[in-house]
Amino acid sequence: MVKQKTIQSEITLKGVGLHTGKEVTMTFKPAPINNGFTFIRVDLEGQPIIEADANYVVNTQRGTNLEKLGVMIQTPEHVLAALVGCDLDNIIIELDASELPIMDGSSKHFVEAIEKVGLIDQDAEREVYVVKEVISYLDEATGSEITVIPSDEYSVTTMVDFGTKVLGTQNASMKSISEFKSEIASCRTFSFLHELEMLLEHGLIKGGDLNNAIVYVDKELSNETMEKLRVAFGKDEISITPNGVLDNLTLHYPNEAARHKLLDVVGDLALIGTKIKGKIIANKPGHFVNTQFAKKIAKIIKNEQRNNVPVYDLNKEPLMDIHKIMSMLPHRPPFLLVDRILSMTDTQVVGLKNVTMNEDFFIGHFPGAPVMPGVLIVEAMAQTGGILILSTVPDPENYLTYFMKIDNVKFKHKVLPGDTLIFKLELLSPIRRGICHMQGYAFANGKLVAEAELMAQIVKNQ
């Protein structure tokens, strides 16, 4: 069993954003189990949290950009690649600006900072999505395609063809994530001269200089363009090296461009939110196709999880019987809707309700055609989740649980007298200040019958 990992202590780095040119202070902090990678904008009121989630991707024009409730996180891919490459699971990233620091255009400085403080194992098993079949995403407009196939470990191969004399076809491979730090982390971002001119004209590369981005000269460099570049980068002289790169940068590898594309793939696929066991093959990758592929994989994982019916021996003694449940929950019949707690961890609880014809709600819902009301299925899920949140306080009998929000409720099948409902509630984020954000599933007869995203808070009974 592989344990989840976080860092042993805080790390702070300072730099500028590549596109905004704004100075930014970034602090990595240890995070609790199942936190994943989360960003906190400490410069904004309320210090909003943005999870590293592919569903928050809004723009991939010159990097990956996330947005949640109007709050932006710009170009996180190099940092995310470093976190994955260092084998981390849980990190909080505090920022006082929207864009992460570009540093030298690679993941090198982030990896070095993480290695300086070291990692620590956490008391929870790492979740890994094992690829069982070929999954692909094709961008028909560009011909870019990413495929994952079954493999014993996470590996990545990138194939790029830029169609220019100075930078043509290149390939790069990472056979194991253990190779990231030595073979991939130091590979810097790059651009072509014609792209650089466009970016400068539109003010999209304010934090760039010739030390944090490789510039390949794919066109004749006029005196006018040379002067613009001198002014933009504050250089007295700019030259072209024999290998077609601006200024005096030395390439770390002949295929550094392909290796950096691989770095971007690793960073963008971190937005899946789960470690992958499979071989990634990326043909002409870019941030758009990378993040679309991440969304596809994340959706597949979610669908598999929601259809994964918990299996329990109902003859076995439960973790909590009805008497133990009543000692924690304030609810009483006929509104006590969970009969047993079958299992519970720090982040998940599984409960059970036997649905019988004796339920009061069947009198009117519906005469002659009894169906359990959907709202009561959601209530039963919430009561099961309430056990999880109440287990975090020493005196649960002195607390009440209140709904704050219910989202994305779906009812799949009817629940009838004689059915046995099994509820699975999983934390979507760590419990903070008595607030619990959960994903709930209800199963009956081996099928998913309902699901909902729930947010609740426990309040001490006055």
How should each PLM-predicted stretch be described?
Residues 1-89, 94-312:
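C-terminal regulatory domains involved in ligand/effector binding and gene-expression control
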Residues 6-10, 319-325, 422-423:
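Short Pro/Gly-enriched beta-strand edge/turn motifs at strand-loop
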Residues 259-272, 341, 347, 371-396:
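Active-site helix/loop of acyl-thioester processing domains in fatty-acid/polyketide metabolism
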Residues 337-340, 405, 410, 424-426, ...:
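Residues located in well-ordered beta-strands
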Residues 90, 279, 339-343, 408:
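Extracellular/lumenal ectodomain signal focusing on beta-strand-rich modules
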Residues 173-190, 372, 442-450, 454-462:
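Flexible glycine-rich active-site/ligand-binding loops centered on an Asp-His dyad
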Residues 273-282, 310-319, 385-422, 449, ...:
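Hydrophobic beta-strand-centered segment that forms part of the acyl-chain substrate-binding groove
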